[in-house]
């Protein structure tokens, strides 16, 4: 009998097919650890030939037993999987981590880290532009693109090797191969040489991450129509670039390639850039990017995106047609659950492929799903946070339901967006009294010293409580941790006097916004 069907009839699940917050955590009925063979008592395994990732991290393929038994098998070596594996190993559990591609996941190899190294190289260009506007400096900065790409690859390789070594030192068994769940406690791994091995575990953690999504008519052909991974590895800076989608990936890529000399056009179907943020943030971002030479088209959907005569051609639903040397499709992510066998392990997949989990991130009595694969929050630090929770849950150190707290998020570049907590739009949707307050960065000495004081800090109050803090401007990502602490501690009003801000700092803009007059918003 299907576990989810049975428990849904018993009232354990919401009737909503895509409900990702199940009513009763699986840990109440999870399999006793004593029902499985002891990992420490299993037959000694012999080490087979070492295999090698493309980033040169050694992963050991094991032989000598038809069924290798572990306390926990982790599928996916990204931030969430690696974090969980490390904590579990330190807690005395035997852990196997199976990775099909690169240790470190998308974040290290083709996401967060390489994009920040790109943006770090062009950051001085933005500073110089601001100082030139103030007529206190002039000049030019040339970035060696080839040298930058080599530096990025060295950094990724070194970081992946360090991660692999640290996990091995903790006692984690690293296995390179494609993992498929064949049962609630069984995983079949197909190694790179075509051989296979079966792993048996008390618990399985699904941490396979996600990949770039595409819509019909806009599927990357990896020639002129590219995804974000293609863009990070592009051989040369394109003369022109169309970016479809103005979320974090699209905005960061647009910023970098514009700074490198590409003529960039951003196309976003929503009414403003950064569509998950409030309109004032997205609209101001569009104005400021326009001043840097980036063309922003919003409120228009893309009809098709194809390669023609070696160029990318984008047809818009309003009849316009755009052509560029390259086009980036940055319209979201899709989970890596196809071929994972999650259903064989007793898990249920939602319509978009995400794994349904309960309040303790359990997808079945023996399986957890963390990070992008459960669809709750597609951020590397959220995956890591979930991985740490799940590890503590397995170790018996954490018994309460998972609580993320306010999740910080940032968009990086010469202009940045930071947010912790909810937007005013989200507050309005939940009802009650909503107020906002703002402080312009123009009044901050450190923002002025950096040459670009455009932007603001915004506070959202919901029924009198501090509910959200966001910011737009140069360097505002550095405010995110202080903003999170302010939100968690509810530092406002008289309580704000207990929180001392150093002077002069960009953080003082947070203080100014918290003390600014509030405005009631109704729409």
Name every feature range the model reports, one short phrase each.
Residues 8, 14, 21, 29-42, ...:
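Low-acidity, Ser/Thr- and Arg-rich intrinsically disordered low-complexity segments
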Residues 67-78, 239-244:
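Beta1/beta-strand and adjacent pyrophosphate-binding region of the FAD-binding site
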Residues 68-70, 87-93, 98-237, 265, ...:
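Glycine-rich flavin
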Residues 73-75, 179, 199-209, 244, ...:
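Short hydrophobic core segments
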Residues 75-80, 84-101, 106, 113, ...:
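Flexible, glycine-rich terminal cap/loop adjacent to redox cofactors
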Residues 112, 208-263, 267, 295-296, ...:
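Glycine-rich dinucleotide-binding loop and its adjacent helix/turn
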Residues 221-238, 321-396, 482:
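FAD-site-proximal beta/loop scaffold in flavoenzymes
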Residues 284, 370-426, 503, 507-523:
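A conserved FAD-binding loop/helix module that cradles the flavin
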